[in-house]
Amino acid sequence: MSQLTDGFGRSFPYLRLSLTEACNFRCSYCLPDGYQVDGRPRFLQVDEIARLVRAFAALGMSKIRLTGGEPSLRKDLDEIIATVAAAPGIRKVAITTNGTLLPRRLPGWHRAGLTALNVSMDSLQRERFRTITGHDRLPEIEQGLALAQALGLPAIKLNAVLLRGLNDDELPQWMDYLRDRPFSVRFIELMRTGDNEAYFQRHHLRADVVIEQLLAAGWHERPRAADAGPAREFGHPDHRGSIGIIAPYSRDFCKGCNRLRVTAKGDLRLCLFGEFGVPLRPLLQRDDDHDALLARITTQLGLKAAGHGLHQGQTGLTPHLASIGG
Protein backbone atom coordinates (compact mmCIF):
# COMPACT_ATOMS: atom_id res chain seq x y z
CA MET A 1 0.00 0.00 0.00
CA SER A 2 1.45 3.37 -1.00
CA GLN A 3 1.14 6.62 0.92
CA LEU A 4 -0.27 9.76 -0.66
CA THR A 5 2.20 12.62 -0.28
CA ASP A 6 2.56 15.98 -1.98
CA GLY A 7 5.56 18.06 -3.01
CA PHE A 8 5.77 19.67 0.42
CA GLY A 9 6.14 16.41 2.34
CA ARG A 10 2.57 16.32 3.65
CA SER A 11 0.81 12.96 3.79
CA PHE A 12 -2.92 12.45 3.29
CA PRO A 13 -4.58 9.61 5.21
CA TYR A 14 -7.96 11.39 5.30
CA LEU A 15 -10.67 12.00 2.67
CA ARG A 16 -13.69 14.25 3.11
CA LEU A 17 -16.38 12.94 0.77
CA SER A 18 -19.45 15.10 0.18
CA LEU A 19 -22.62 13.09 -0.45
CA THR A 20 -24.96 15.97 -1.31
CA GLU A 21 -25.05 19.73 -1.66
CA ALA A 22 -28.56 19.87 -0.19
CA CYS A 23 -29.10 21.00 3.39
CA ASN A 24 -32.18 21.35 5.58
CA PHE A 25 -30.71 24.21 7.62
CA ARG A 26 -30.38 27.90 6.76
CA CYS A 27 -27.23 28.79 8.67
CA SER A 28 -26.52 32.50 8.50
CA TYR A 29 -22.84 31.95 7.66
CA CYS A 30 -23.44 29.38 4.92
CA LEU A 31 -26.92 29.15 3.31
CA PRO A 32 -29.02 31.97 4.83
CA ASP A 33 -31.64 31.57 2.08
CA GLY A 34 -31.64 27.79 2.22
CA TYR A 35 -30.46 25.33 -0.41
CA GLN A 36 -31.31 26.42 -3.93
CA VAL A 37 -31.74 23.51 -6.32
CA ASP A 38 -29.85 24.02 -9.57
CA GLY A 39 -31.62 21.88 -12.14
CA ARG A 40 -31.68 18.19 -11.21
CA PRO A 41 -28.34 17.50 -9.53
CA ARG A 42 -27.19 13.90 -9.64
CA PHE A 43 -24.85 13.16 -6.80
CA LEU A 44 -22.48 10.20 -6.59
CA GLN A 45 -24.24 6.85 -6.38
CA VAL A 46 -23.28 3.93 -4.14
CA ASP A 47 -21.39 2.00 -6.83
CA GLU A 48 -19.40 5.12 -7.73
CA ILE A 49 -18.64 5.77 -4.07
CA ALA A 50 -17.43 2.18 -3.69
CA ARG A 51 -14.94 2.57 -6.56
CA LEU A 52 -13.80 5.95 -5.29
CA VAL A 53 -13.16 4.74 -1.74
CA ARG A 54 -11.38 1.59 -2.93
CA ALA A 55 -9.03 3.78 -4.96
CA PHE A 56 -8.18 6.13 -2.10
CA ALA A 57 -7.75 3.18 0.26
CA ALA A 58 -5.36 1.57 -2.22
CA LEU A 59 -3.33 4.79 -2.04
CA GLY A 60 -3.03 4.58 1.73
CA MET A 61 -6.07 6.46 3.01
CA SER A 62 -7.57 4.97 6.15
CA LYS A 63 -10.17 7.55 7.22
CA ILE A 64 -13.26 8.69 5.32
CA ARG A 65 -15.48 11.50 6.55
CA LEU A 66 -18.92 11.76 4.95
CA THR A 67 -20.11 15.35 4.64
CA GLY A 68 -22.61 17.44 2.72
CA GLY A 69 -24.52 19.68 2.55
CA GLU A 70 -26.32 17.54 5.06
CA PRO A 71 -25.42 13.87 4.46
CA SER A 72 -28.31 12.52 6.54
CA LEU A 73 -30.66 13.66 3.75
CA ARG A 74 -29.39 10.72 1.68
CA LYS A 75 -31.96 7.94 2.05
CA ASP A 76 -29.26 5.41 1.16
CA LEU A 77 -26.83 6.62 3.84
CA ASP A 78 -26.85 3.30 5.73
CA GLU A 79 -25.79 1.52 2.55
CA ILE A 80 -23.13 4.15 1.83
CA ILE A 81 -21.63 3.79 5.31
CA ALA A 82 -21.57 0.00 5.02
CA THR A 83 -19.93 0.25 1.59
CA VAL A 84 -17.23 2.62 2.85
CA ALA A 85 -16.60 0.58 6.00
CA ALA A 86 -16.17 -2.60 3.95
CA ALA A 87 -13.38 -1.18 1.78
CA PRO A 88 -10.05 -2.89 2.57
CA GLY A 89 -7.79 -0.52 4.49
CA ILE A 90 -10.50 1.81 5.79
CA ARG A 91 -10.31 1.89 9.59
CA LYS A 92 -12.41 4.93 10.45
CA VAL A 93 -15.75 6.06 9.00
CA ALA A 94 -16.95 9.41 10.29
CA ILE A 95 -19.85 11.70 9.49
CA THR A 96 -20.39 15.43 9.91
CA THR A 97 -24.08 16.26 10.38
CA ASN A 98 -26.34 18.93 11.81
CA GLY A 99 -27.67 16.19 14.07
CA THR A 100 -31.41 16.65 13.63
CA LEU A 101 -31.95 13.09 12.40
CA LEU A 102 -29.66 11.39 14.93
CA PRO A 103 -32.47 10.13 17.21
CA ARG A 104 -34.05 8.22 14.30
CA ARG A 105 -31.10 7.19 12.18
CA LEU A 106 -27.96 6.91 14.29
CA PRO A 107 -28.55 3.27 15.36
CA GLY A 108 -28.67 2.24 11.70
CA TRP A 109 -25.49 4.15 10.88
CA HIS A 110 -23.76 2.57 13.85
CA ARG A 111 -24.75 -0.93 12.75
CA ALA A 112 -23.50 -0.12 9.25
CA GLY A 113 -20.02 0.70 10.53
CA LEU A 114 -19.92 4.35 11.62
CA THR A 115 -17.05 4.91 14.07
CA ALA A 116 -16.98 8.68 14.63
CA LEU A 117 -19.49 11.51 14.80
CA ASN A 118 -19.15 15.27 14.29
CA VAL A 119 -22.20 17.41 15.02
CA SER A 120 -22.55 21.07 14.09
CA MET A 121 -23.69 22.90 17.22
CA ASP A 122 -23.07 26.63 16.98
CA SER A 123 -24.64 27.55 20.30
CA LEU A 124 -25.67 25.95 23.58
CA GLN A 125 -28.50 28.46 23.89
CA ARG A 126 -31.71 27.42 22.17
CA GLU A 127 -32.80 30.84 20.89
CA ARG A 128 -29.33 31.68 19.62
CA PHE A 129 -29.14 28.31 17.92
CA ARG A 130 -32.41 29.08 16.14
CA THR A 131 -31.13 32.51 15.10
CA ILE A 132 -27.91 31.12 13.63
CA THR A 133 -29.32 28.01 11.92
CA GLY A 134 -32.86 29.08 11.09
CA HIS A 135 -34.28 26.09 12.99
CA ASP A 136 -35.31 25.38 16.58
CA ARG A 137 -33.79 21.87 16.70
CA LEU A 138 -31.34 21.97 19.58
CA PRO A 139 -33.36 19.51 21.74
CA GLU A 140 -33.23 16.82 19.02
CA ILE A 141 -29.49 17.30 18.68
CA GLU A 142 -28.96 16.94 22.43
CA GLN A 143 -31.08 13.77 22.36
CA GLY A 144 -28.94 12.45 19.51
CA LEU A 145 -25.72 13.13 21.40
CA ALA A 146 -27.02 11.22 24.41
CA LEU A 147 -27.86 8.32 22.09
CA ALA A 148 -24.36 8.43 20.58
CA GLN A 149 -22.90 8.07 24.07
CA ALA A 150 -25.27 5.21 24.88
CA LEU A 151 -24.22 3.39 21.71
CA GLY A 152 -20.59 3.72 22.72
CA LEU A 153 -19.34 5.70 19.73
CA PRO A 154 -15.66 6.19 20.53
CA ALA A 155 -15.26 9.65 18.99
CA ILE A 156 -17.83 12.43 19.36
CA LYS A 157 -16.97 15.96 18.32
CA LEU A 158 -19.01 19.14 18.20
CA ASN A 159 -18.33 21.94 15.72
CA ALA A 160 -19.09 25.57 16.52
CA VAL A 161 -18.29 28.39 14.10
CA LEU A 162 -17.02 31.46 15.98
CA LEU A 163 -19.30 34.40 15.24
CA ARG A 164 -18.59 37.84 16.66
CA GLY A 165 -21.73 39.30 18.19
CA LEU A 166 -23.67 36.03 17.95
CA ASN A 167 -21.98 33.34 20.05
CA ASP A 168 -18.57 34.70 21.03
CA ASP A 169 -19.48 35.06 24.73
CA GLU A 170 -20.32 31.37 25.29
CA LEU A 171 -16.86 30.00 26.09
CA PRO A 172 -17.54 29.81 29.88
CA GLN A 173 -20.75 27.90 29.16
CA TRP A 174 -18.89 25.50 26.87
CA MET A 175 -16.24 24.91 29.53
CA ASP A 176 -18.94 24.00 32.02
CA TYR A 177 -20.62 21.77 29.43
CA LEU A 178 -17.38 19.81 28.95
CA ARG A 179 -16.72 19.27 32.63
CA ASP A 180 -18.61 15.96 32.66
CA ARG A 181 -18.93 15.18 28.94
CA PRO A 182 -16.15 13.37 27.03
CA PHE A 183 -16.73 15.38 23.85
CA SER A 184 -14.25 17.38 21.82
CA VAL A 185 -15.60 20.80 20.86
CA ARG A 186 -14.03 22.41 17.79
CA PHE A 187 -14.25 26.18 17.55
CA ILE A 188 -13.86 27.08 13.89
CA GLU A 189 -12.80 30.51 12.74
CA LEU A 190 -15.26 31.91 10.20
CA MET A 191 -13.87 31.69 6.67
CA ARG A 192 -14.48 34.06 3.81
CA THR A 193 -16.22 32.41 0.84
CA GLY A 194 -17.56 33.68 -2.45
CA ASP A 195 -21.01 34.43 -1.03
CA ASN A 196 -20.35 35.81 2.45
CA GLU A 197 -18.04 38.84 2.20
CA ALA A 198 -20.30 41.28 4.08
CA TYR A 199 -21.17 38.65 6.70
CA PHE A 200 -17.50 37.85 7.14
CA GLN A 201 -16.59 41.48 7.77
CA ARG A 202 -19.39 41.77 10.34
CA HIS A 203 -18.91 38.54 12.29
CA HIS A 204 -15.34 37.31 11.83
CA LEU A 205 -13.52 36.74 15.12
CA ARG A 206 -9.88 35.72 15.22
CA ALA A 207 -9.35 32.41 16.98
CA ASP A 208 -6.48 33.95 18.98
CA VAL A 209 -9.10 35.64 21.16
CA VAL A 210 -10.49 32.28 22.27
CA ILE A 211 -7.03 30.78 22.78
CA GLU A 212 -6.14 33.64 25.13
CA GLN A 213 -9.32 33.00 27.13
CA LEU A 214 -8.59 29.27 27.33
CA LEU A 215 -5.07 29.82 28.62
CA ALA A 216 -6.30 32.35 31.17
CA ALA A 217 -8.82 29.78 32.45
CA GLY A 218 -6.15 27.14 33.04
CA TRP A 219 -6.47 25.14 29.83
CA HIS A 220 -3.24 23.84 28.32
CA GLU A 221 -2.33 23.10 24.73
CA ARG A 222 -1.67 19.43 24.09
CA PRO A 223 1.29 18.26 22.00
CA ARG A 224 0.32 17.80 18.38
CA ALA A 225 0.82 14.32 16.97
CA ALA A 226 2.89 13.98 13.82
CA ASP A 227 -0.17 12.89 11.82
CA ALA A 228 -2.56 15.41 13.39
CA GLY A 229 -4.66 17.79 11.32
CA PRO A 230 -4.72 21.57 11.63
CA ALA A 231 -6.65 21.78 14.93
CA ARG A 232 -4.83 22.95 18.06
CA GLU A 233 -6.08 20.85 20.99
CA PHE A 234 -6.52 22.09 24.57
CA GLY A 235 -7.33 20.17 27.73
CA HIS A 236 -7.96 20.86 31.40
CA PRO A 237 -7.38 18.44 34.31
CA ASP A 238 -10.84 19.16 35.74
CA HIS A 239 -12.74 18.53 32.49
CA ARG A 240 -13.52 15.26 30.71
CA GLY A 241 -13.93 17.04 27.39
CA SER A 242 -11.42 18.91 25.25
CA ILE A 243 -11.43 21.97 23.02
CA GLY A 244 -9.91 22.24 19.56
CA ILE A 245 -9.24 25.46 17.68
CA ILE A 246 -9.34 25.50 13.89
CA ALA A 247 -7.81 28.78 12.76
CA PRO A 248 -7.43 28.92 8.97
CA TYR A 249 -5.93 32.41 9.13
CA SER A 250 -3.08 31.36 11.41
CA ARG A 251 0.38 31.44 9.90
CA ASP A 252 1.11 27.69 9.93
CA PHE A 253 -2.41 26.36 9.34
CA CYS A 254 -1.69 24.66 6.01
CA LYS A 255 1.43 22.89 7.31
CA GLY A 256 -0.87 20.43 9.07
CA CYS A 257 -3.09 19.72 6.07
CA ASN A 258 -3.75 15.98 5.92
CA ARG A 259 -6.97 15.72 3.95
CA LEU A 260 -8.31 15.81 0.41
CA ARG A 261 -11.88 16.45 -0.66
CA VAL A 262 -14.24 15.03 -3.25
CA THR A 263 -17.44 16.88 -4.06
CA ALA A 264 -20.88 15.29 -4.26
CA LYS A 265 -20.57 15.32 -8.05
CA GLY A 266 -17.21 13.59 -8.07
CA ASP A 267 -14.63 16.37 -8.41
CA LEU A 268 -11.37 16.06 -6.50
CA ARG A 269 -10.57 19.27 -4.62
CA LEU A 270 -6.99 19.56 -3.46
CA CYS A 271 -7.87 22.47 -1.16
CA LEU A 272 -11.07 23.80 0.38
CA PHE A 273 -10.28 27.12 -1.32
CA GLY A 274 -8.65 25.78 -4.47
CA GLU A 275 -9.14 27.35 -7.88
CA PHE A 276 -10.07 24.15 -9.69
CA GLY A 277 -11.63 20.72 -9.32
CA VAL A 278 -10.45 17.54 -11.01
CA PRO A 279 -13.26 15.37 -12.44
CA LEU A 280 -13.00 11.80 -11.17
CA ARG A 281 -16.51 10.69 -12.06
CA PRO A 282 -15.71 9.52 -15.60
CA LEU A 283 -13.36 6.98 -14.01
CA LEU A 284 -15.94 5.77 -11.47
CA GLN A 285 -18.20 3.97 -13.94
CA ARG A 286 -16.26 0.71 -14.39
CA ASP A 287 -14.02 -1.42 -12.20
CA ASP A 288 -11.60 -1.62 -15.14
CA ASP A 289 -10.73 2.08 -14.72
CA HIS A 290 -9.22 1.54 -11.25
CA ASP A 291 -5.60 2.02 -12.35
CA ALA A 292 -6.45 5.12 -14.38
CA LEU A 293 -8.26 6.54 -11.35
CA LEU A 294 -5.20 5.96 -9.14
CA ALA A 295 -3.00 7.67 -11.71
CA ARG A 296 -5.27 10.71 -11.96
CA ILE A 297 -5.36 11.16 -8.19
CA THR A 298 -1.60 10.85 -7.69
CA THR A 299 -0.78 13.09 -10.65
CA GLN A 300 -3.09 15.84 -9.47
CA LEU A 301 -1.76 15.69 -5.92
CA GLY A 302 1.53 16.94 -7.31
CA LEU A 303 -0.27 20.22 -8.12
CA LYS A 304 -1.41 20.89 -4.54
CA ALA A 305 -0.27 24.32 -3.40
CA ALA A 306 1.55 25.06 -0.15
CA GLY A 307 -1.26 27.26 1.18
CA HIS A 308 -4.86 28.35 0.66
CA GLY A 309 -4.48 32.01 -0.32
CA LEU A 310 -7.04 33.31 2.20
CA HIS A 311 -4.62 36.01 3.33
CA GLN A 312 -4.70 37.35 -0.22
CA GLY A 313 -8.51 37.37 -0.22
CA GLN A 314 -8.75 34.31 -2.46
CA THR A 315 -11.76 32.01 -1.94
CA GLY A 316 -11.37 29.85 -5.02
CA LEU A 317 -14.33 27.90 -6.36
CA THR A 318 -16.13 27.69 -3.02
CA PRO A 319 -19.33 29.81 -3.08
CA HIS A 320 -20.39 28.54 0.36
CA LEU A 321 -19.29 25.70 2.63
CA ALA A 322 -22.36 23.56 1.88
CA SER A 323 -21.03 23.10 -1.64
CA ILE A 324 -18.07 21.06 -0.42
CA GLY A 325 -18.70 20.20 3.23
CA GLY A 326 -15.96 22.21 4.91
From Swiss-Prot:
S-adenosyl-L-methionine listed as a keyword: yes
Entry's Gene Ontology BP terms: Mo-molybdopterin cofactor biosynthetic process
Protein name: GTP 3',8-cyclase
Chain sites annotated for binding [4Fe-4S] cluster 1: C23, C27, C30
Summary of subunit composition and partner proteins: Monomer and homodimer.
The reaction(s) this protein catalyses: GTP + AH2 + S-adenosyl-L-methionine = (8S)-3',8-cyclo-7,8-dihydroguanosine 5'-triphosphate + 5'-deoxyadenosine + L-methionine + A + H(+)
UniProt-listed Enzyme Commission number(s): 4.1.99.22
Alphabetical list of InterPro entries matching this protein: Aldolase_TIM, Elp3/MiaA/NifB-like_rSAM, MoaA, MoaA_NifB_PqqE_Fe-S-bd_CS, MoaA_twitch, MoCo_biosynth_MoaA/MoaC, rSAM
GO molecular function, one term: 4 iron, 4 sulfur cluster binding
Ligand binding (S-adenosyl-L-methionine): Y29, G69, S120, M191
Enzyme class label: lyase
The UniProt record lists the keyword GTP-binding: yes
Note on cofactor: Binds 2 [4Fe-4S] clusters. Binds 1 [4Fe-4S] cluster coordinated with 3 cysteines and an exchangeable S-adenosyl-L-methionine and 1 [4Fe-4S] cluster coordinated with 3 cysteines and the GTP-derived substrate.
Cofactor: [4Fe-4S] cluster
Function field: Catalyzes the cyclization of GTP to (8S)-3',8-cyclo-7,8-dihydroguanosine 5'-triphosphate.
Record keywords: 4Fe-4S, GTP-binding, Iron, Iron-sulfur, Lyase, Metal-binding, Molybdenum cofactor biosynthesis, Nucleotide-binding, S-adenosyl-L-methionine
Species: Stenotrophomonas maltophilia (strain R551-3)
This protein's pathway: Cofactor biosynthesis; molybdopterin biosynthesis
Residues annotated as domain Radical SAM core: 7-232
Residues that hold GTP according to the record: R16, R65, T96, K157, R259, L260, R261
Family, as annotated: Belongs to the radical SAM superfamily. MoaA family.
